């Protein structure tokens, strides 16, 4: 990993939720950690395809937000896994930020 990437990770990652909003962060904070998932995709012809994936949730931005990263297939199965039917092999991410000024989540 290069120096720029290490710097990005060090400012993005947080060890715990921000104390001034920890109670509100519990809504999604309960998912913090690594999860294995079963993916089911339905093809236009009615076919059903199943595969494995993983989701990683973590605190970011001084504990004021939660980020997840979805991976299909699981990281350990890459790069030799054939494309998952219908959806293909992919990464995705979501950032969830609790906004205390409106008492709501921005996703």
Model features per residue range: what roles?
Residues 42, 62, 73-76:
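Short active-site-proximal "capping" loops at secondary-structure junctions
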Residues 38-42, 71, 98:
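A generic structural motif
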Residues 47-50, 87-89:
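Short glycine/proline-enriched turns and hinge-like loops at secondary-structure junctions
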Residues 72-107:
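Helix-adjacent hinge/juxtasegments
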Residues 32-36, 62-69, 102-106:
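Short, hydrophobic/aromatic-rich segments at coil-to-beta transitions
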Residues 25, 67-69, 80-81:
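Periodic aromatic/glycine/histidine/acidic cluster detector
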């Amino acid at each position: 990993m290069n120096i720029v990437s290490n710097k990005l990770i060090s400012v993005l990652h947080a060890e715990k939720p921000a104390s001034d909003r920890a109670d509100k962060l519990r809504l999604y904070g309960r998912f913090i950690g690594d999860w294995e998932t079963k993916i089911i995709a339905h093809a236009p012809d009615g076919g059903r395809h199943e595969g494995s994936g993983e989701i990683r949730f973590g605190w970011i931005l001084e504990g004021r937000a939660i980020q997840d990263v979805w991976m299909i297939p699981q990281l350990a199965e890459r790069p030799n896994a054939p494309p998952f039917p219908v959806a293909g092999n992919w990464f995705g991410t979501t950032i969830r930020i609790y906004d205390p000024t409106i008492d709501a989540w921005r996703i």
